[in-house]
């Protein structure tokens, strides 16, 4: 909460000046003015010449007020950020650090701006103005160096802690701000750019810093040297020199999208995850050796456990990798686990001729497409309801249109998919979800599989109080990044 002085203008508007953060000795902005309706405050909010702005006040921007982080699902290993006492959470709960010291300054002042979660852990990041660099926090499992610290001596973090290492404290981090933070199953990556650089400009590629850490036994970190795990984040200068705008991660492989629309892959290739048409692992990033990919400009990509989908500039989808569950194209029943496909076009004929694809996604054994008109489609395994289609209506190996709401016509704004759970935000600001809820990943009380979209009222209430701006779904838990309340 923030305190400051106020005066009333025209009996309707409050003028707030010189807002002070209670844990700071200096003004957040010496000449900061806010105009709010006077009916947002009551006498209990005001003491002498000070006032308290509470979380139910609407109409302020996230750059001026603090972000919040919430979690729900299974609390095993402390990955929810609430210690070991919280074994499960159904109603999303705000994550707070009780110790108010310099290490926790960024988290406690609400400056977290990126979140991610792997199989059994959570990571949060924000920019520390005093240290002039991005800082990272984490909780949960650390047996594969997912949380950077300990060098093998700390198996898990039961509570949220600051994650520091020689690389993260080096001068190379100075002035670099986080563009992307992402997790695979047990490995992670981030892209950092100078705050004054144009992230999509090839001329600035040498300014980027691309770090990878965690499990690295299959080469998924991109280092030429073999390490089973990588604690201190590896500075992948090969990717920095190429110029990368996005990274996506599967179970044990990584694919990077360059500024000029090309894909570079490294890691395991048991199912042709790397797209080269073979089963040879790669330790360092290499341009994918495939004519279809080289002939197309790729504008987005997403990796599932062992397959990938990529969106081209002409609104087509390319896909490759494991295909036992028909997530790339139809295969006969009983196809073996070793089934995989080379790079090929996904059949999108069920979409309208002028239906532009605006988002793609991939989870364990599934792929998803969201179009400009608000329709969402799924393909792949439906064993845990991941496709959002009743068993009797599900068609294997082709895109299934998912119907949201009682009439099936509610439009989708964006979606979040990972493992066996999907959550969508609709254009009218509501949340629906389907798939596995065995660990309350959907914030629903009943532990079961949901084959069709269910409205998620716990998330609706959270969104009403504090805007949900990002959700990271893991195997058995979820975390969300939330900003200011809606107007």
From Swiss-Prot:
The keyword Transmembrane helix does not apply. PROSITE patterns: RCC1_3. InterPro entries: Ran_GTPase-activating, RCC1/BLIP-II, Reg_chr_condens. Keywords: Repeat. SUPFAM superfamilies: RCC1/BLIP-II. The keyword Repeat applies. RCC1 repeats lie at residues 66-127, 207-259, 260-313, 373-426, 428-483. This is RCC1 repeat-containing protein DDB_G0284033. It comes from Dictyostelium discoideum.
């Amino acid at each position: 909460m923030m305190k400051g002085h106020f005066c009333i203008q025209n009996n309707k508007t409050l003028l707030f000046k010189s807002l002070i953060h209670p844990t700071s000795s200096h003004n957040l902005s010496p000449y900061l003015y806010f105009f709010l309706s006077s009916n947002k405050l009551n006498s209990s909010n005001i003491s002498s010449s000070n006032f308290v702005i509470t979380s139910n006040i609407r109409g302020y921007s996230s750059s001026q007020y603090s972000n919040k982080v919430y979690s729900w699902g299974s609390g095993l290993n402390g990955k929810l950020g609430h210690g070991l006492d919280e074994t499960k959470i159904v109603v999303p709960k705000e994550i707070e650090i009780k110790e108010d010291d310099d290490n926790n300054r960024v988290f406690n002042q609400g400056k977290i701006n990126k979140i991610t979660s792997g199989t059994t852990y959570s990571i949060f990041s924000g920019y520390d103005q005093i240290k002039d660099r991005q800082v990272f926090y984490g909780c949960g499992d650390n047996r594969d160096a997912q949380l950077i610290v300990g060098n093998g001596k700390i198996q898990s973090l039961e509570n949220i802690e600051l994650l520091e290492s020689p690389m993260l404290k080096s001068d190379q981090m100075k002035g670099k701000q986080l563009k992307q933070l992402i997790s695979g199953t047990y490995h992670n990556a981030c892209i950092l750019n100078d705050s004054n650089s144009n992230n999509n400009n090839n001329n600035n590629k040498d300014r980027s810093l691309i770090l990878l850490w965690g499990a690295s036994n299959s080469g998924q970190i991109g280092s030429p040297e073999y390490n089973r795990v990588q604690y201190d984040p590896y500075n992948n200068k090969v990717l920095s020199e190429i110029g990368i705008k996005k990274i996506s991660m599967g179970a044990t492989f990584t694919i990077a999208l360059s500024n000029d629309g090309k894909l570079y892959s490294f890691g395991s290739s048991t199912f042709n995850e790397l797209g080269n048409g073979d089963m040879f692992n790669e330790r360092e990033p290499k341009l994918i050796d495939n004519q279809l990919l080289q002939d197309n400009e790729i504008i987005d990509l997403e990796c599932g456990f062992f397959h990938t989908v990529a969106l081209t500039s002409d609104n087509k989808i390319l896909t490759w990798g494991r295909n036992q569950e028909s997530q790339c194209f139809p295969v006969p029943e009983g196809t073996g686990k070793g089934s995989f496909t080379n790079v090929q076009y996904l059949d999108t004929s069920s979409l309208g001729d002028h239906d532009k694809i605006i988002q793609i996604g991939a989870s364990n054994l599934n792929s998803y497409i969201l179009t400009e008109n608000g329709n969402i489609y799924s393909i792949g395994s439906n064993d845990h309801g991941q496709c959002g289609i009743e068993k009797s209506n599900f068609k294997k190996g082709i895109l299934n249109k998912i119907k949201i709401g009682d009439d099936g016509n509610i439009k989708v704004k964006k979606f979040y998919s990972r493992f066996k759970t999907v959550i969508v935000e609709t254009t009218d600001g509501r949340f629906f979800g389907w798939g596995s809820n065995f660990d309350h990943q959907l914030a629903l009380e009943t532990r079961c599989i949901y084959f069709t979209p269910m409205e998620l009222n716990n998330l609706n209430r959270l969104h009403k109080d504090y805007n949900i701006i990002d959700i990271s779904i893991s195997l058995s838990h979820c975390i969300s990044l939330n900003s200011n309340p809606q107007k």
